[in-house]
């Protein structure tokens, strides 16, 4: 598709506008870049913390978020702080959050939407997980899913991730691969006075029901991998003509959520 050369630029621009996103080490203070996070009350404590791919982090800023809230955060970690003495033994790191933004959350749902026709005001998705983003990660039951969509700026979109609950996996290289279908539909028609452009979005989809359904079909957590299908081209003159794209196999391990220690 002729727009795909825009994806890398758009994605980098969006992430940079949220936070500083380069890995850096300044005076022994570490910033791992923009990171996906799920807010939880940690263990038996009353402290609200965030589960990240780096482990559990704590900041007083997290107290303003509810249990299970999905965020993108940028934080500094200073191992020399007294609060971080024996951090590994305590099970969490005290950090300074430099910026955070909430992520749209919803459930992966069944049944599968009709793949032979478009949704009302469906928008083409240019890419899923563009540039192999580090923000594509499964935390607990949430799959953080970066996507790039071709639409008009500031146009509200409804995203959905659906699946066939009775599907049987395709087995490749001893991996059991299941299919999820990502779609985006605008809530309103196309504004006449606005040009279309590539828009980068991150959604967090709860895969709890998907994992449960696949396990009931005989799937095992250790073998559950996914491909994500998405409509990548729509003929603007004939909406019956559209094509499906598909991601490479995701080796994000789809284990069922384990509660925090």
Say what each PLM segment does.
Residues 2-9:
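Bacterial N-terminal signal peptides that target proteins for export
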Residues 18-21:
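C-terminal motif of bacterial Sec signal peptides marking the signal peptidase cleavage site
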Residues 24-89:
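Start-of-domain marker
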Residues 79-84, 231-239:
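Short acidic/polar inter-strand loop motif in beta-rich domains
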Residues 92-148:
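Surface-exposed beta-loop interaction hotspot
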Residues 129-194:
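Short helix-loop boundary/capping segments
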Residues 187-222:
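Short, solvent-exposed, Trp/other aromatic-anchored flexible loops in extracytoplasmic proteins
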Residues 252-261:
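Conserved small/polar residues in nucleotide/adenosyl-binding loops
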């Amino acid at each position: 598709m002729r727009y795909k050369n825009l994806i890398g630029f758009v994605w980098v621009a969006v992430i940079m506008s949220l936070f500083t996103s380069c890995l850096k080490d300044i005076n022994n203070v570490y910033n791992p870049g923009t990171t996906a996070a799920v807010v939880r009350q940690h263990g038996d404590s009353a402290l609200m913390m965030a589960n990240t791919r780096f482990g559990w982090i704590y900041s007083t800023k997290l107290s303003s978020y509810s249990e299970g809230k999905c965020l993108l955060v940028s934080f500094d970690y200073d191992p020399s702080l007294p609060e971080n003495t024996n951090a590994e033994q305590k099970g969490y790191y005290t950090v300074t959050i430099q910026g955070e933004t909430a992520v749209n959350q919803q459930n992966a749902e069944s049944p599968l939407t009709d793949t032979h026709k478009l949704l009302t005001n469906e928008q083409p998705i240019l890419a899923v997980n563009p540039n192999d983003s580090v923000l594509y990660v499964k935390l607990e039951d949430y799959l953080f899913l970066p996507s790039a969509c071709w639409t008009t700026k500031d146009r509200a979109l409804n995203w959905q991730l659906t699946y066939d609950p009775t599907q049987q996996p395709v087995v490749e290289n001893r991996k059991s691969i299941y299919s999820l279908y990502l779609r985006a539909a605008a809530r309103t028609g196309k504004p006449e006075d606005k040009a279309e452009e590539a828009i980068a979005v991150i959604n967090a989809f709860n895969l709890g029901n998907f994992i449960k359904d696949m396990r009931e079909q005989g799937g095992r957590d250790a073998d559950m991998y996914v491909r994500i299908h998405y409509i990548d081209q729509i003929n603007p003159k004939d909406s019956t003509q559209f094509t499906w794209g598909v991601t490479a196999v995701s080796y994000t391990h789809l284990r069922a959520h384990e509660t925090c220690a």
